[in-house]
């Protein structure tokens, strides 16, 4: 499953 990278690229 997805983590905090592919689902939230807001760095």
Curated annotation (Swiss-Prot):
Modified-residue entries (Phenylalanine amide), positions: 11
GO biological process: defense response; regulation of blood pressure
GO cellular component term, pick one: extracellular region
Modification Sulfotyrosine, positions: 4
PTM: Isoform 2.1Y4 differs from isoform 2.1 in not being sulfated.
Modification Pyrrolidone carboxylic acid, positions: 1
Subcellular localization(s) per the UniProt record: Secreted
Tissue: Expressed by the skin dorsal glands.
Function recorded in the entry: Hypotensive neuropeptide.
The name this protein goes by in its record: Caerulein-2.1/2.1Y4
Organism this protein belongs to: Ranoidea citropa (Australian Blue Mountains tree frog)
